UniProtKB/Swiss-Prot annotation:
<feature type="transmembrane region" description="Helical">
    <location>
        <begin position="122"/>
        <end position="142"/>
    </location>
</feature>
<feature type="transmembrane region" description="Helical">
    <location>
        <begin position="223"/>
        <end position="243"/>
    </location>
</feature>
<protein>
    <recommendedName>
        <fullName>UPF0259 membrane protein WIGBR3650</fullName>
    </recommendedName>
</protein>
<keyword id="KW-1133">Transmembrane helix</keyword>
<keyword id="KW-0812">Transmembrane</keyword>
<keyword id="KW-1003">Cell membrane</keyword>
<dbReference type="GO" id="GO:0005886">
    <property type="term" value="C:plasma membrane"/>
</dbReference>
<dbReference type="InterPro" id="IPR009627">
    <property type="entry name" value="UPF0259"/>
</dbReference>
<comment type="similarity">
    <text>Belongs to the UPF0259 family.</text>
</comment>
<feature type="transmembrane region" description="Helical">
    <location>
        <begin position="89"/>
        <end position="109"/>
    </location>
</feature>
<feature type="transmembrane region" description="Helical">
    <location>
        <begin position="190"/>
        <end position="210"/>
    </location>
</feature>
<feature type="transmembrane region" description="Helical">
    <location>
        <begin position="23"/>
        <end position="43"/>
    </location>
</feature>
<dbReference type="Pfam" id="PF06790">
    <property type="entry name" value="UPF0259"/>
</dbReference>
<keyword id="KW-0472">Membrane</keyword>
<feature type="transmembrane region" description="Helical">
    <location>
        <begin position="148"/>
        <end position="168"/>
    </location>
</feature>
């Protein structure tokens, strides 16, 4: 049985449309969580403008990065730290909530013996949040380390670990095991995994650029929530795509779990 991208896209889209209300609900809650955390830790408008003015003439070379950092005062370094903490923490917690609830929802719906309920889903997924926090932090760390060296290694890391969030919801699968199995599955299905991950990253980059401008210019929080929501909805579609591919791969080889 061959697995084509076209069939996967259609299958994922059908599931996505059928569950659109639940998807919007979880995506909205995740967006609100991310926005609240971002608001709590984000530097105020004056601090952001000060930082923006400092880097306005920065051309991006490594030497200039070192020079810029050395030129910063302790207060400006603290502002940069708060900005970084705000972005990373809001993304980490929001994604942990989103991934745990969406994958739990898919597991429940696929198991026709169980009835899906939003509030029961939140309760069931809450026990998975610590594992997702750890896994997402680890994936983000490895991906950013790869991108710090060169862009391609970071993308490769993300591609090969893309099944691990699905796998850790299975019984007796540790974070380490989920990573190992994810690499194995991805290696066997690289032609159907890589294109969708590349597309997802491109869309996320566009959203990131726009939302970063919103942060610098101090737009309303409701507008930022909207961009978080759009990002979450797109991410959910990718999760559904990857889950469907995982199921088909499991049927095809029947030896991943």
């Amino acid at each position: 049985m061959s697995i084509s991208i076209k069939n996967l896209i259609l299958d994922a889209w059908n599931f996505f449309v059928n569950q659109i209300i639940n998807i919007i609900f979880f995506s909205t809650i995740s967006a609100i969580i991310s926005s609240l955390i971002n608001y709590i830790f984000l530097p105020n408008r004056d601090e952001l403008f000060t930082l923006a003015n400092l880097i306005s003439d920065f051309n991006g070379s490594i030497n200039n990065i070192n020079y810029l950092f050395q030129k910063m005062s302790i207060e400006q370094k603290y502002i940069l730290f708060k900005l970084s903490l705000s972005n990373h923490l809001s993304s980490l917690v929001g994604n942990a909530f989103l991934f745990s609830n969406i994958i739990t929802m898919i597991n429940t719906i696929c198991d026709k013996k169980r009835f899906f309920n939003i509030f029961n889903n939140i309760i069931l997924s809450s026990s998975l949040i610590p594992k997702f926090l750890t896994l997402i932090f680890l994936i983000s760390f490895l991906t950013q380390c790869g991108m710090a060296l060169m862009l391609i290694p970071g993308i490769i890391v993300l591609i090969f670990l893309s099944f691990s969030p699905i796998l850790i919801t299975k019984k007796n699968i540790s974070i380490t095991d989920s990573i190992k199995i994810s690499v194995n599955i991805t290696f066997k299905n690289i032609k159907t995994v890589a294109p969708i991950i590349f597309l997802w990253l491109l869309i996320k980059l566009i959203i990131l650029v726009i939302s970063s401008q919103i942060s610098i210019n101090g737009f309303l929080s409701s507008v930022k929530i909207f961009f978080y929501l759009i990002n979450n909805i797109i991410t959910v579609y990718i999760i559904i795509y990857m889950y469907r591919l995982y199921l088909l791969s499991k049927i095809k080889k029947n030896k991943y779990l």
